[in-house]
From Swiss-Prot:
This is Protein FAM83D. All members of the FAM83 family of proteins share a conserved N-terminal DUF1669 (domain of unknown function 1669) domain of about 300 amino acids. This domain mediates the interaction with casein kinase 1 (CK1) isoforms. Therefore, it has been proposed to rename DUF1669 the polypeptide anchor of CK1 domain. Residues 426-438, 462-488 have a biased composition (Low complexity). Residues 338-581 are annotated as: Required for interaction with KIF22 and function in chromosome congression. The gene is FAM83D. Belongs to the FAM83 family. It comes from Bos taurus (Bovine). Phosphorylated during mitosis. Through the degradation of FBXW7, may act indirectly on the expression and downstream signaling of MTOR, JUN and MYC. May play also a role in cell proliferation through activation of the ERK1/ERK2 signaling cascade. May also be important for proper chromosome congression and alignment during mitosis through its interaction with KIF22.
Length: 581
């Protein structure tokens, strides 16, 4: 009867070979080790020269030489396959297979999802063999090909499925494992080659599946043997073991890999074993699982940074309010996506244009005919403004823009003719600041609604000032209050009509986004300061009306238009900065 061993640490070295302990002379060759050192240090040329000098046979073919050079990792370098984490054996010693402890210093990882309760040497039934080949021919054993036979065995699982594979990219087999683990409650263990783990993660990305979210499925990585040269160079071997253990009583092994090409194009074979022989595969899987490592956190983070798992993150829709934070988020999102044309405020602009047209219809015929001379100039200015950004078309027609600009000019002339000094001092600052901000803004065309908004308060101001001439001084003060409110309203409509992102986003550079964000912030700050300045002007005008301008209100002369307009800034400076005059 075979001896029983309670743990993996009690296995003797004789179990590694069925013929007894191996001959050390067959396992180790100093000449070949030195030849490998020459290959890592000097390349293929130095390797061939060393073989000729020592009269050794070429024990490495050209493909193996290239594979070793690709897998070699110099000290301080991170290999693409290693994922910045060493395997279980290489993380504790830096020797080339010269340290064999009788007992491990660390406890092996537990099979946390469960494992069949078979003790060592337990009877598992009579040994049976079933062979399958790909492509399936007339003389192939069994009615199924390799892939169909494997999927049929997976559906018969009741307790556990353990997979050891080099490459795993077949989506059909992965969906079968996922469905079995979710619906039937079967534990699934998957051990993959660390060098080919990225291909498995690519498949998970295509299927919109996160490996860490599966409750009854665990994925870990393994490597082959690791060789350390005297210079510190490390060579990591690959995994060529391929078997699938099912419930501890059946195992499917062979040259078949979990890829579409092996199932349809490549020639492969699959052998299904059952009975007592499965005990050896059970032991081998537990040894490999003890040497395995979880998926590297750096590799997962690199996948997240590259956007491979962005579909798993809940993205909240952006708010439609016109705020600085929303504008910044919208601009960053468009810089990272495909540039496209964005229409902002189209319907609102058309509605406001209709309202603006009804308000500006009160202009006299003389002003209207005099303003038609300026339509060509308005059109030229509009064309120059729209050409600041290539490929952009104006949002409104040329005639509408010219009409609105002329309406605003006519109302401004009415203000200069009728308004008093105090009222003019209240309306100069917002108008100047609005004009300055419009000139600074590049590549942004104001909507018709914003221009109509500029004209509407002006008409209100003209009506209030005309009525103040026929009323007392109290009515004129009310007209000045209405003018200050109208100037603030017109400035707000002009300011918030253009701070949105440009209609064409053609550059992916971050400095463009940063410059536009600073421009929007500067415009909001200027609007805030202009509002404070306008309110201060109004308060100072109300307080100083009884002392400075009482005679001007009562003895207003219609022939002193030029003198009042010339001294307008001086009056404003006296009210704001009396100590510097």
């Amino acid at each position: 009867m075979a001896l029983r061993y309670d743990g993996l640490d009690e296995l003797p070295a004789a179990c590694l070979s069925p013929c007894g302990p191996p001959n050390p002379a067959e396992l180790y060759s100093e000449e070949r080790r030195l030849a490998l050192e020459e290959l890592l240090a000097g390349g293929p040329g130095a390797f061939s020269a060393f073989l000729r000098r020592e009269r050794l046979g070429r024990f490495l073919n050209p493909d193996e030489v290239r594979s070793i050079l690709r897998a070699a990792e110099r000290p301080g370098e991170e290999g693409a396959a290693a994922g910045a984490e060493d395997s279980f054996g290489s993380s504790h010693d830096c020797s080339s297979g010269t340290y064999f402890p009788e007992q491990s210093d660390l406890e092996p990882p537990l099979l946390e999802l469960g494992w069949p309760a078979f003790y060592q040497g337990a009877y598992r039934g009579a040994t049976r063999v079933e062979a399958h080949f790909q492509p399936r021919g007339a003389g192939a054993g069994g009615p199924y090909g390799c892939k169909d036979a494997l999927r049929q065995q997976l559906r018969l699982a009741r307790e556990v499925i353990a997979v050891v594979m080099d490459v795993f990219t077949d989506i059909d087999i992965f969906r079968d494992l996922q469905e079995i683990s979710r619906k039937q409650g079967v534990a699934v263990y998957i051990l993959l080659d660390q060098a080919l783990l990225s291909q498995f993660l690519d498949m998970c990305m295509d299927l919109k599946v996160h490996p860490e979210e599966e409750k009854l499925m665990t994925v870990r990585t393994i490597t082959g043997n690791i060789y350390y040269a005297r210079s510190g160079t490390k060579i990591v071997g690959k995994v060529h073991e391929k078997f699938t253990l099912i419930d501890g009583i059946r195992v499917a092994t062979g040259s078949y890999s979990f890829t579409w090409t092996d199932g349809k194009l490549n020639s492969s074979n699959l052998v299904i074993l059952s009975g007592q022989v499965v005990e050896h595969f059970d032991l081998e899987f537990r040894i490999l699982y003890a040497q395995s490592k979880p998926i590297s956190s750096k590799l997962l983070s690199s996948f997240r940074i590259s956007g491979r798992f962005d579909h798993l993150v809940d993205q909240k829709p952006l708010s439609k309010e016109l705020t600085l934070g929303n504008l910044l988020r919208l601009r960053l999102a468009r810089l990272s996506s495909t540039p496209r044309k964005v229409e902002l405020g189209g319907e609102e602009g058309r509605a406001e244009a209709v309202c603006g047209a009804s308000k500006t219809s009160t202009i006299s015929e003389e002003d209207y005919f005099s303003s038609r001379k300026d339509r060509l100039e308005g059109r030229r200015v509009t064309d120059a403004a729209t050409q600041t950004e290539p490929g952009e078309t104006p949002a409104v027609s040329m005639s509408d823009v010219g009409t609105q600009a002329s309406a605003a000019t006519a109302c401004t002339g009415t203000q200069t003719t009728v308004a008093t000094r105090v009222v003019s001092s209240q309306t100069v600052v917002p108008t100047t600041s609005a004009t300055t901000q419009t000139d600074v803004d590049e590549g942004v065309l104001a909507s018709p609604g914003s221009q109509s908004k500029e004209g509407s308060p002006v008409s209100k101001m003209s009506v209030s000032r005309s009525s103040s001439l026929r009323s007392s001084s109290s009515l004129s003060s009310q007209g000045s209050v209405a003018s200050s409110i109208g100037s603030q309203t017109s400035f707000r409509s002009t300011d918030f009509a253009t701070p949105g992102p440009p209609k064409y986003q053609s550059t992916p550079h971050f400095d463009l986004c940063f410059r536009d964000s600073l421009r929007n912030l500067n415009k909001e700050r200027q609007f805030h300061f202009a509002g404070i300045r306008s309110r201060l002007n109004h308060m100072l005008a109300m307080l100083s009306r009884k002392t400075f301008l009482t005679e001007n209100y009562l003895s207003f002369n219609s022939g002193s238009f030029a003198r009042s307009s010339a001294n307008l800034l001086a009056v404003r400076e006296i009210m704001l900065y009396p100590s510097y005059q």
